[in-house]
Amino acid sequence: MRHLSFLFALLLCMTSPFISLANDPDTALGIINGKVVDDASNQPVAYAAVVIKSEDGTKTITGGITTEDGNFEIKKLPDGTFIFEVQFIGYKTYSQKLIIAKGKRNLNLGTVILEEETKELEGVEVVAERTTIEQRVDRKVINVGKDLTTAGASAADIMNNIPSVNVDAQTGDISLRGNSNVRVMVDGKLSNVPVAQLLKQIPSTSIKSIELITNPSAKYNPEGMSGIINIVLHKNANIGFNGNINMGLTKGIEAKFNSSVDLNYRNGKFNFYGNYGNNIGKWVNDGSILRVEENSRQKFDFFNNNKSHLYKLGVDFYLNDKNTISFFTNQNIYDGKGDGKTQVTYFNNPSRNVTQLFFDDSNNRSEQYNFDYKLDFNKEGHNIELEVDHNLFESEQDADFSSTGASTFPNYMDFVDTDRTQTTANLDYVNPLDSISKLELGLQSRNFETKVDYSSTGQSFNSNGDLVPTPSTKFVYDMDIYSAYATFGQSYEKWSYQMGVRIEDVQVKADTNAVRAFTDKYTEIYPSGFVTYKPNEKDQLQISYSRRVDRPGLQQVNPIREFATPLLSAFGNPNLVPQFTSSYEVNYTKRIKNGSVTGGVFYRSITDEINRAIYIDRLDLNKTILTFDNFDNTSAYGVELSTNYKPIKWWSINGSFDLFSQTQRGLTETLNTTDPNPTEDDIVEEKVKVDNTAWNLRMNNSFTVTKKLTLQAFGFYRGRNKSIQFDANPMYFVNLGARYSFAEGKGTLSFNYNDIFNTMRFAFEGSYPYAQEGSFNWESNNVYVGMSYRFGSGKNRAKSRKRRDNNTKQGGGGIL
């Protein structure tokens, strides 16, 4: 507690000069304010255009956009009669007449309700779909389910269709703007499940939306160079009993099934809600790697049979209009079995051929318990909120390895048990000091503990070259983070700004077999700043800055072997230190007739970069070890362009282009010989520098054929991508889809044919640690059939809760 008290006191000293900037607006001119909400859900409508026109409606006088909470305020209006309008894609335009005069210069319009736009087609009323991608001030929001391209078996299946996001189908690693240092959240909370596994376990039908926050403010935790990806799950709060049922079947080589049920009951002061989703199926994966100089090939065949179940139960208790208590729990259960075969063939010397078989049996359970209390004061937007989140994760993995041929290792089994605990407590205070100023203060405590137990029945070589029993390892990794933040912002007629600072005190310790292997303590300051210029309701320019950190993730510091093949093993490095990034962005949004265009540029300055290190195994010089290390400072930059446009009423287009460039540095070792029996004298160490520029292009077209039938076509192209390990060849695919609505729009049937030309595969070539080339294939060519049905009705008064980012940098790399 003394950590938080000290940090909070320091923040008050730093922010008091900014609080004095708050001032009252000019009362000689008119002011109008209010809040815009959705008619069906009663949720705030963020970033809707608010327009003030002349009395005859022919001239635009001024305007603005609503905040994320749906609030708006227009100032400095002269006396007179005006037309007030609120516009947003997918809604009817709201319009009313206003009179500004002496004694009536401060108008509170209260709640402005927007109704969904409807069209009459052949006598049947059809509700218009809202834009799939919403461009907000600090984030992009992708509405899953509004678009056939976001239909699939799991979160991992839909991520590649999202602008600036890429998922490696082989390893499950996710990247944002070409960088894997991205934080992934579920409902704004950390999950103890490793990200690659988490994306495969969440059924796509359980997801409401996905948010991309590329330059978060000081209110958010600073982890993640490239930003935050927040997966928002469904939660109902409609009056009465309501629900949604979804199910889908994907068929490639094997079949995969997912389904979800989303229910709620609200009456009076209570809202009870729950969600169940599952993802059950079999996956096939294969590939090969050719070592050019020694003329050998590794061939891989993998098969997985996985089952995951996700449960969410919660209750909101509205004590009165000022006090709300909420509780929810997420339970995630996973059971996976896999087997694989690795064949190493030496074409010039078949006597060295090796075949390794393995069987993997793993299961895990993640439990999350969350409590929240919110107190609203009399002033609109003035509140304090306390949240406590406790997360448990248990995992057991048993792997059985057997080899035939020239292998010198007897058959063996590996056993890995993992236990993780995280407790987070937040206290947040928000105060609109006046009509143009807003102050936010907060404290946070995060406590992590991870225990990994490893044992094996196998043998390994010691330093003398003798086979000895593989020692057991117990690795304990603890991290405590205490932080405080403050943000202050003001909004004027055309200009707005926000400044913030976050202070963190971090303590890290790691023990291997009860011996202290590593400790680290540091206190850092993370400033942020945003300046926004809105000359009119159609244009917006924003410049932002934030300082970020990438703390080494568990797999990057864990000395226990992550995976192994006959020629490759991967380990963590307990001596890694954090990587720091200064991130700069400029974004411009232009609203045009029937759509909008958003463009942006970003630049990152990176210190103590964490990247791959590739070593020759000293106990077997024909094998390679993958690990991580810190390297020299570097930088990265990129550009993004996205648009949504409706050229005619039955055709809408969503497109995006992103380009990023970064200089990467790493360490590699190679063998300077072709002798099949090399010595340590043949090892050559080299510091590698790679200049990489890569780009992605996505284009989605949606066609309204009839009142009930919609067709879609989606195309994706990823350019060549370089890294320390290899250069990845270009990749591309085309998906086609159709959707049919029934039961007066309450039900939908969806059909997707993905990767119709079967072109999506990962192919590469590289020089480290050996000259090699290869490719990997998965079930990208598949058919998806889905159905959803909603029932019940009622108005929504959803509990508004903050969304937070949490995570640490994950391991990664794959088996190349």
What label would you give each PLM region?
Residues 254-281, 295-340, 365-367:
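Transmembrane beta-barrel wall of Gram-negative outer-membrane proteins
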Residues 75, 189-214:
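Short acidic/polar hinge/loop motifs at secondary-structure boundaries
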Residues 413, 422-426, 466-473, 478, ...:
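Outer membrane beta-barrel strand-and-loop segments of large Gram-negative receptors
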Residues 111-113, 155-158, 174, 197-198, ...:
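N-terminal periplasmic accessory domains that precede
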Residues 55-71:
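Short, acidic Ser/Thr/Gly-rich low-complexity loop/linker segments typical of extracellular
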Residues 232-245, 285-288, 308-313, 322-325, 394-396, 507-508, 537-583, 603-626, ...:
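Surface-exposed extracellular loop regions of Gram-negative outer-membrane beta-barrel proteins
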Residues 24, 37, 49-53, 87-89, ...:
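Short, acidic, small-residue-rich periplasmic hinge/interaction motif at the N-terminus
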